[in-house]
Amino acid sequence: MSPAIALAFLPLVVTLLVRYRHHFRLLVRTVLLRSFRDCLSGLRIEERAFSYVITHALPGDPGHILTTLDHWSSCCEYLSHMGPIKGQILMRLVEEKAPACVLELGTHCGYSTLLIARALPPGSRLLTVERDSRTAAVAEKVIRLAGFDEQMVELIAGSSEEVIPRLRAQHQLNRADLVLLAHRPRYYLRDLQLLEAHALLPHGATVLADHVLFPGAPRFLQYTKSCGRYRCRLHHTSLPDFPAIKDGIAQLTYTGPG
């Protein structure tokens, strides 16, 4: 490319960098720096986060563990977790619905799992599914460190596509009063339809889906609005530590087959 052509594109490049500067910062923190630290330490980000938690958080205090994870994500390495603002929305909805049984798809480091478990009424049960075995091992430690036993919070390592059909037979889950989709948005529609197909959603069940605006789940949103089985509401929010990057949590109420 000649210098003249390169100069012609310079204003466009500068404009894009300015407009998407927050997205560029996010890319640097979540991809470039994370990959570098993974190679340098031989540990994944979730494992490094747990090393910080185990030395700074109070065992048996889920609130303090959550605050410790927030601090580590803001000051050390960006964790790509739900964060305190979305977390308040999640806890409020769990407290309002008071579900007897909750299914979470996408445990990650256990952050949202602790939020749900804190807000559940006595006697309720939470099943959380994490595809990656190393991440699941970290989340298991976080959950137990917070003081939640296996009777209340059961972690299942495996892909949601394989786990959902086995929930009734292998994990005695006959119905999920509340479901949190917090794994990869491209799988939201597939997994929602699996839950429908296996009759795991009772009438009035609540389905919450994170990251429906960023990175986005357009096919999932289109389906839930057009299939006639859900009442839909969107809670507008943003990414933790990146208030300029807008996101949202979809709240669905299952009304039965259309």
UniProtKB/Swiss-Prot annotation:
GO terms for molecular function: catechol O-methyltransferase activity. Interacts with LHFPL5, PCDH15, TMC1, TMC2 and TMIE. Interacts directly with TMC1. The interaction of TOMT with TMC1 and TMC2 is required for the transportation of TMC1/2 into the stereocilia of hair cells. SUPFAM superfamilies: S-adenosyl-L-methionine-dependent methyltransferases. S-adenosyl-L-methionine binds at E104, G106, T107, S112, E130, S160. It catalyses: a catechol + S-adenosyl-L-methionine = a guaiacol + S-adenosyl-L-homocysteine + H(+). Disulfide bonds: none annotated. It is an enzyme of class 2 (transferase). The gene is Tomt. Its main location: cytoplasm. GO terms for biological process: auditory receptor cell development; catecholamine catabolic process; developmental process; dopamine metabolic process; methylation; positive regulation of protein import; sensory perception of sound. It holds the Pfam family Methyltransf_3. It comes from the Eukaryota. CDD domains: AdoMet_MTases. The lineage of its organism: Eukaryota, Metazoa, Chordata, Craniata, Vertebrata. Gene3D superfamilies: Vaccinia Virus protein VP39. PANTHER family: CATECHOL O-METHYLTRANSFERASE 1-RELATED, TRANSMEMBRANE O-METHYLTRANSFERASE. Its EC number is 2.1.1.6. Belongs to the class I-like SAM-binding methyltransferase superfamily. Cation-dependent O-methyltransferase family. PROSITE patterns: SAM_OMT_I (PS51682). The keyword Repeat does not apply. This is Transmembrane O-methyltransferase homolog.
